[in-house]
């Protein structure tokens, strides 16, 4: 989330209100993988 790679199509919430999701990957609903470039 917030990152370029963090998008709804990627299984993550591409919303700026979820900055933690882009760094820890907790923004992903099915695949909790770390999103590069999130920090």
Curated annotation (Swiss-Prot):
* InterPro entries per record: Natr_peptide
Which residues are part of the propeptide segment? 1-8
Keyword Disulfide bond carried by entry: yes
Covalent S-S links between cysteines: 12-28
The protein's matches in Pfam families, at most eight in alphabetical order, are given as: ANP
Q: List localization entries.
A: Secreted
Q: Name one GO cellular component term.
A: extracellular region
Superkingdom of this protein's organism: Eukaryota
Its tissue distribution reads: Expressed by the venom gland.
Keyword Secreted assigned to the entry: answer is yes
Tell me one GO molecular function of this protein: toxin activity
Q: Which GO biological-process labels does this protein carry?
A: regulation of blood pressure; vasodilation
Using the UniProt annotation, give all residue ranges assigned to the region (Disordered).
1-39
In terms of one coarse class, where is the protein primarily found? secreted
- Alphabetized UniProt keyword annotations: Disulfide bond, Hypotensive agent, Secreted, Toxin, Vasoactive, Vasodilator
Function according to Swiss-Prot or TrEMBL:
Snake venom natriuretic peptide that targets both NPR1 and NPR2. Exhibits hypotensive and vasodepressor activities.
Family membership, please give it.
Belongs to the natriuretic peptide family.
- Its name, as the record gives it, is Natriuretic peptide PaNP-d
């Amino acid at each position: 989330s917030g990152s370029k790679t963090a998008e709804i199509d990627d299984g993550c919430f591409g919303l700026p209100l979820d900055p933690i999701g882009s760094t820890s990957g907790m923004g992903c609903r099915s695949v909790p993988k770390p999103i590069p470039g999130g920090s």
